[in-house]
């Protein structure tokens, strides 16, 4: 047997620093929204993405936002303010369910886009 194979020599291997770092937990990341419209638009973009309807998504968000009643817009704005201090994912989901369940008279655009994803 070859004498070199009896006593192996371990050589140091240089590894990139990224392999030694631990992965960050993505679930604890919270997003801070500047105002209610930005929060509403981000949620609606996710819904439109799931439904596969991306044609003019930002324009649709704006139209829907302006057709919402004042108290609904105020609720989204308060949630956006609250996002500066705590995680608001649970409250956002609750507000979305309320919006889905409401049938707003005269807001055909809103009903059309929301009913697609239900």
Curated annotation (Swiss-Prot):
Induction cue: By nitrogen starvation.
Gene Ontology cellular-component annotations: nucleus
Keyword annotations from UniProtKB, A to Z: DNA-binding, Nucleus, Stress response, Transcription, Transcription regulation
One term of GO molecular function: DNA binding
Main location: nucleus
Highest rank taxon of the organism: Eukaryota
Matches recorded under InterPro entries: HMG_box_dom (IPR009071), HMG_box_dom_sf (IPR036910)
Localisation: Nucleus
UniProt DNA-binding region: 29-97
Role: Mating type proteins are sequence specific DNA-binding proteins that act as master switches in yeast differentiation by controlling gene expression in a cell type-specific fashion. Required for conjugation and efficient meiosis.
Additional record remark: There are three genetic loci for mating type genes in S.pombe, mat1, mat2-P and mat3-M. Cell type is determined by the alternate allele present in mat1, either P (plus) in a h+ or M (minus) in a h- cell. Mat2-P and mat3-M serve as donor of information that is transposed to mat1 during a switch of mating type.
Full protein name: Mating-type P-specific polypeptide Pc
UniProt source species: Schizosaccharomyces pombe (Fission yeast)
């Amino acid at each position: 047997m070859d004498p070199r194979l009896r006593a192996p020599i371990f050589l140091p291997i240089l590894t990139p620093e990224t392999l030694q770092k631990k992965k960050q937990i993505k679930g604890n990341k919270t997003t801070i929204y500047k105002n209610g419209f930005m929060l509403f638009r981000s949620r609606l973009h996710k819904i439109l993405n799931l439904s596969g309807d991306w044609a003019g998504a930002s324009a649709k968000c704006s139209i829907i936002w302006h057709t919402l009643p004042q108290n609904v817009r105020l609720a989204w704005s308060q949630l956006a303010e609250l996002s500066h201090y705590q995680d608001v994912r649970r409250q956002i989901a609750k507000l979305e369910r309320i919006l889905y369940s409401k049938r707003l008279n005269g807001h055909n655009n809103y009903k059309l886009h929301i009913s697609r994803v239900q």
